[in-house]
A protein has these predicted regions:
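Gly/Ser/Thr-enriched, mixed-charge loops and adjacent short helices
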Residues: 25-34, 142-271
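An N-terminal, well-structured beta->alpha segment
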Residues: 2-94, 101, 182-183, 187-218, ...
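Phosphate-binding and adjacent anionic-ligand microenvironments
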Residues: 278, 282-284, 305, 325, ...
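N-terminal small/polar loop signature for handling phosphorylated ligands or for N-terminal nucleophile
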Residues: 78-141, 234, 241-297
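Conserved phosphate/anionic-ligand binding catalytic regions in large, soluble enzymes, centered on
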Residues: 30-50, 135, 222-230, 234, ...
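Short acidic, glycine/serine/threonine-rich loops at helix termini
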Residues: 88-93, 118-121, 140-146, 229-234, ...
Length: 549
């Protein structure tokens, strides 16, 4: 099998990446098969069935074409792609396969963001949508996300069905396709019209509302991705021009040369933005990840000091400020079960109903669809990993609408001689100070997968837990879909889908553990209202030392 793949190396689109791999890395591409999981596909480049290349992309596309023809008589798909290596090439390969096998494809000629894709699926009434992106992963990654007709990512059941169709493609090296030029001439692959982009921009403008003043100054960065120029265009339309762009960090560039990883969850991502803010005396720095579904912010003060806000803190700001703006009598917040503990306390304090879902924004999208006819107003949907949604004209994380609204709130606070930090401190004074931390432990190769399983098996067996002076209350085991009262041993069913997640709830907050759905990583979530927060984190890490599990 390996020889057949090597014979087609020059056609694979990934020859230059293959040539940089070690022998072990090359072998790993043949030890596994890329699977379409509940989070889509995400991997590194290389040859073999376990890596991203022209042939594994075409295999996905043929399976997807057969899946679409099963659910629709006249399937139509819109594809968007980000600024990563091979994103455009992969989108064209998918378009060729889909078009050859009976699916109409809408294909833009330049990069677009994830929220634009989610919006376009609904706006154009397509059967499905595809986003080529690996979000904020390192530059040698790419991936595929699939969206249903509602604009949300595919849920578990349709994902499994699609996966079956993909698995039925047994000869990915010899899939016959028509050329793109012919498919375009026959109007099977059709161009993406600017009207959809204008409709999305109008939806964001309607959400945010025009600026009446512009005294606060903002630095914008796309981290070499897709949020610019659309975000700057929207701000101009909203009568806000008091911003500067960190141009060296906002040129589309697959290498992401100005950052280690293009991830606004990491504070050092803002180093260049801070320098520009100093030169420009700006008050706010906003950075979005490459596909513009996540964002981060840093606030700068008159004395030149700055404050970085983590994902939970941004959520608290949005929850409080949007609640005050809406003044709705019946409202709700949708969040993941690993989102910070204080968000639920704040929602309760503000009389906002809370809907908890599993990790993954597709579960938030599912709730949005279920609530379409509900009279309650959505205040905020968010995850701690810097993903937010204020209005469901998009059905995935939307850093563009969120950025515009945060800039508007910053301007309003400036008029009141207030800052985001002031708003957060008021919340802490009222409800207590919680600290949040998310750790990503990376495990490499097949051995790493075994280590992750070993750790999760350990947690799966626990009926109680001791960490410092924390008082354990409940263990929520989403693997078993059981919630256990630590004191009484009483068990109850968790009314959410099964997931590889265990959450330890204490009187002081929670600690949760789960493997990543897209990468060989273990994620640990800490959200606690304690003085010795770092001590608790260190003790927990010592206790799960993989050599002693």
């Amino acid at each position: 099998m390996k020889q057949a793949w090597e014979d087609k190396l020059s056609e694979s689109l990934v020859e230059s990446f293959h040539n940089e791999l070690t022998e072990q890395e090359i072998e790993e591409g043949f030890q596994d098969t890329l699977a379409f999981g509940t989070a889509g596909i995400r991997s590194t480049f290389g040859i073999g069935p376990g890596r991203l290349n022209k042939f594994t992309i075409q295999k996905f596309a043929l399976g997807f074409a057969n899946y679409l023809k099963d659910i629709s008589d006249e399937p139509k798909v819109i594809i968007h792609f980000d600024t990563r290596y091979l994103s455009k090439e992969f989108s064209e390969e998918i378009a060729k396969v889909l078009g050859t096998y009976g699916v109409i494809v809408v294909l833009p000629d330049t990069y677009k963001s994830t929220p634009e894709l989610s919006f376009a699926v609904c706006h154009l009434n397509t059967t499905a949508g595809i986003m080529i992106t690996a979000s904020h992963n390192p530059k040698n990654y790419n991936g595929i996300k699939v969206y249903g007709a509602d604009g949300g990512q595919l849920l578990t059941e349709p994902s499994l069905k699609l996966s079956e169709y993909i698995d039925q493609v047994t000869d990915p090296l010899n899939i016959k396709v028509n050329d793109l030029k012919t498919l375009k001439e026959n109007n099977i692959v059709i161009p993406f019209e600017n009207e959809t982009t204008e409709a999305y921009k109008k939806a964001v403008c309607d959400l945010v509302g025009a600026f009446k003043t512009q005294n606060s100054k903002t630095v914008l960065s796309s981290l070499h991705g897709t949020s610019l120029p659309i975000l700057s265009d929207i701000l101009h339309d909203l009568s806000y021009d008091h911003f500067v762009i960190e141009t060296s960090q906002s040129e589309p560039d697959s290498d992401f040369p100005t950052v280690n990883i293009a991830n606004p969850e990491m504070e050092n991502t803002f180093d260049l933005g801070k320098e520009l803010a100093d030169r420009e005396s700006a008050n706010l720095i906003v950075a979005t990840d490459p596909d513009a579904d996540r964002l981060g912010i840093v606030e700068r003060y008159e004395d030149g000091t700055t404050r970085y806000f983590n994902g939970n803190e941004i959520g608290l700001l949005l929850l409080k400020l949007r609640h005050d703006e809406l003044q709705s009598t019946k409202s709700n917040m949708i969040k993941s079960v690993v989102t910070g503990a204080l968000s639920e306390k704040l929602a309760e304090h503000l009389h906002i109903d809370v809907i908890n879902v599993l990790t993954g924004f597709k579960y938030i999208s599912e709730q949005l669809k279920a609530l379409e006819n509900d009279e309650a107003k959505l205040v905020l949907a968010f995850e701690e990993s810097h993903g937010y949604l204020l209005n469901d004209f998009s059905r995935d994380k939307d850093a563009i609408q969120t950025a515009a609204l945060l800039i508007k709130y910053k301007e309003q606070l400036t008029q009141e001689n207030q800052t985001f930090k002031d708003v957060l401190e008021t919340i802490y004074e009222t409800l207590g100070h919680y600290q949040d931390k998310t750790l990503s432990l990376t495990f490499k190769g097949m051995e790493g997968k075994a280590q992750i399983k070993q750790i999760m098996d350990h947690f799966n067996r626990l009926t109680t837990i001791e960490v410092g002076n924390l008082k354990p209350l409940v263990i929520e085991n989403y693997i078993k879909q059981e919630s256990t009262n630590v004191e009484t041993g009483e068990q109850s069913k968790i009314d959410l889908p099964q997931a590889d997640l265990i959450k330890f709830i204490f009187e002081e907050g929670f600690i949760a553990v789960r493997p990543s759905g897209t990468e060989p990583k273990m994620k640990l979530y800490f959200s606690l209202g304690v003085e010795d927060f770092e001590g608790i984190v260190e003790e927990f890490l010592r206790d799960i030392d993989i050599d002693h599990v």
